[in-house]
């Protein structure tokens, strides 16, 4: 399954707020409408929707998410927490969480277009896995600097999570450590995602 490129508002109406996909928020339906359409939701559907939240928030394909689940299963520790750490340490997500892009698709475009450096080297792979002590900077070109400056001004309301630090004057971010569960910028039950893939991974 390829990466989703359709209307983003349609997705957040169904799944709720997904800050990585779009900075828009869904319009809440009235309580009377909710009551009239209330149905018993199957456990499978609940697990499916949690999986879809991860996929759309981080902007990855079904195959990529399945691969991350397989990697997480092989690692020591909580599979769900390791899965979230793998996704959060992707370069496109780090660029987004630093406030250098308004969304993860926007961050992916910056990386693809070679505007972003990791440890002073251009990295154009959005899935690149960042690690503690990595520095994230912007290419020293007028176009690159202008794009990031505009994005930083737009994202000033967003708080940089504790596992990252960002110097807006130098446009430099630093990965301090692997993030903890509380720093995830998404309301998600990762255990349901692991259960969804229990027969596939």
Curated annotation (Swiss-Prot):
Subcellular location: Plastid, Chloroplast
UniProt keyword annotations, A-Z: Chloroplast, Plastid, Ribonucleoprotein, Ribosomal protein, RNA-binding, rRNA-binding
Matching NCBIfam families: PRK05327.1, rpsD_bact
PROSITE patterns the UniProt entry points to: RIBOSOMAL_S4, S4
Domain of life: Eukaryota
Subunit structure: Part of the 30S ribosomal subunit. Contacts protein S5. The interaction surface between S4 and S5 is involved in control of translational fidelity.
Annotated ranges, domain S4 RNA-binding: 89-150
Example of a GO MF term: structural constituent of ribosome
SMART domains the UniProt entry points to: Ribosomal_S4, S4
Gene: rps4
Any one annotated GO CC term: chloroplast
Record flagged with keyword RNA-binding: yes
Function according to Swiss-Prot or TrEMBL: One of the primary rRNA binding proteins, it binds directly to 16S rRNA where it nucleates assembly of the body of the 30S subunit. With S5 and S12 plays an important role in translational accuracy.
Protein family membership: Belongs to the universal ribosomal protein uS4 family.
Stored PANTHER family: 30S 40S RIBOSOMAL PROTEIN, SMALL RIBOSOMAL SUBUNIT PROTEIN US4M
Record's protein name: Small ribosomal subunit protein uS4c
Biological process terms in GO annotation: ribosomal small subunit biogenesis; translation
């Amino acid at each position: 399954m390829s990466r989703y490129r359709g209307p983003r508002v349609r997705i957040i109406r169904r799944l709720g707020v997904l800050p990585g996909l779009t900075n828009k928020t869904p319009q809440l339906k009235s309580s009377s409408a909710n009551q009239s359409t209330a149905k018993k939701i199957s456990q499978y559907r609940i697990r499916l929707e949690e999986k879809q939240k991860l996929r759309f928030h981080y902007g990855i394909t079904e195959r990529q998410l399945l691969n991350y689940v397989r990697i997480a299963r092989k690692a020591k520790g909580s599979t769900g927490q390791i899965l979230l750490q793998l996704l959060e340490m992707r370069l496109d997500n780090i660029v987004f969480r630093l406030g250098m892009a308004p969304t993860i698709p926007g961050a992916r475009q910056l990386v693809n277009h070679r505007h972003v450096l990791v440890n002073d080297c251009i990295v154009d792979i959005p899935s690149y896995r960042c690690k503690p002590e990595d520095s994230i900077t912007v290419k020293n070109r007028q176009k690159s600097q202008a794009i990031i400056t505009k994005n930083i001004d737009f994202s000033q309301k967003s708080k940089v999570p504790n596992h990252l630090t960002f110097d807006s004057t130098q446009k430099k971010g630093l990965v301090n450590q692997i993030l903890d569960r509380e720093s995830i910028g998404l309301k998600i039950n990762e255990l349901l995602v692991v259960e969804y893939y229990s027969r596939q991974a």
